[in-house]
Amino acid sequence: DFIVDTCMEIVENYDIDAIHFDDYFYISGADDSKTREKYNTEGLSLGDFRRKQVDLFIEDLSNHLRSYNTTNNRCVQLGISPSNVYRNGGYSSTPRYDESGNLISPLYSNTGGFAHYDDYLYSDTLNWINHEWIDYIMPQCYHSLENKYAPYADCIRCWSWAVRYKKVNLYAG
């Protein structure tokens, strides 16, 4: 609630275009064992628990911003700038979607670099895109076309597939 309230205080008191998160959420080595012990009533794994907490935050902030925008005839956006790799894995040249336009495959990019879904950030940005909780995504695609771990073209292609049928803009960072 504190972070959502802080964001809304900024939105309500300053003429801004967006709330933007960059290099966000869980820091490397964070010990939240006492929090998990108290609130993890579903027995989720560390990764699933953390992703759920971040999902709940993003959804809550999104709902607050949409309500504010509707009430005040504004268009303050919510944006995220994640690391360029969602998840590592195999490659497919043809995306597949469900009836809601959610990307079902590939859920992994043809990469071997740091991935924010599993590594310590535990952020399910594809879920945020699928639910349209964010207005834009600006992945940190800083690698060259020839980078062997996270080639630019492979990363940006996967992101373009993820937003194809969603009301989420893709900006290359």
Regions found by a protein language model. Give the residues of each.
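Surface-exposed substrate-engagement region within the catalytic domains
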Residues: 131, 145-173
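Polysaccharide-binding and catalytic clefts of secreted carbohydrate-active enzymes
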Residues: 1-133, 142-143
